[in-house]
Design a protein with these regions (language model features):
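Phosphate/nucleotide-binding beta-alpha loop and adjacent structural elements of enzyme active sites
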Residues: 1-177
Length: 177
């Protein structure tokens, strides 16, 4: 089940932006690429895993698919997400969340960073989401976390937080004079 894929390598201090997905035009330069072997999780033979952290620069959904049926043996995932397409054909958070919910996971928490209040190809919000297998939660917890998820992921919420931070910076500069 191994496959050979092209890794687009970001230059210099942006090397953390290297990805298996082709880059969009941006301020980050990708002057080289290299062929790498991509393995499915199921081919690694690992067992008894309590938590998985996935940060693969837009390739998270493909990594999750590589878990196949073993995904339901893992109680907890922390997954990087973006609500904009930072790389060509990058699944956005909505698609990632739908996949996880169909597999029986509930989004419990997010660490979210907002670089643009309204998502477009040049930015939006991104961060990490914690998912827990719903079999480990009470029904009331599932309801609570589901409502909180929808409130936190409204674009209006992102815009509010973004402009609130800008207002604070402006006030500090104005008051600091």
């Amino acid at each position: 089940n191994d496959s050979i894929s092209k890794l687009y390598v970001a230059d210099g201090e942006d090397s953390g932006s290297s990805s298996l997905l082709a880059p969009r035009e941006s301020e980050i330069t990708f002057s080289t690429s290299q062929e790498i072997t991509v393995k499915k999780f199921t081919s690694l033979g690992l067992k008894n895993i309590d938590m998985v952290v996935i940060d693969t620069q837009g390739y998270e959904l493909e990594v999750l698919k590589g878990f196949e049926s073993y995904i339901n043996a893992i109680p907890c995932f922390i997954i990087e997400f973006a609500n904009y397409e930072g790389y060509l054909k990058q699944p956005v958070y909505k698609e990632l969340n739908l996949f996880m919910r169909k597999k029986g996971f509930v989004p419990i928490a997010q660490i979210k960073r907002i670089n643009k209040p309204f998502p477009n190809i040049n930015g939006g919000s991104f961060g990490d989401a914690l998912y827990v297998d719903k079999k480990l939660l009470r029904k009331s917890e599932i309801i609570f976390f589901t409502i909180r998820y929808y409130l936190i992921n409204l674009i209006i919420y992102d815009a509010f937080i973004f402009f609130k931070k800008r207002l604070k910076k402006s006030l500090k500069r104005y008051i600091g004079r």
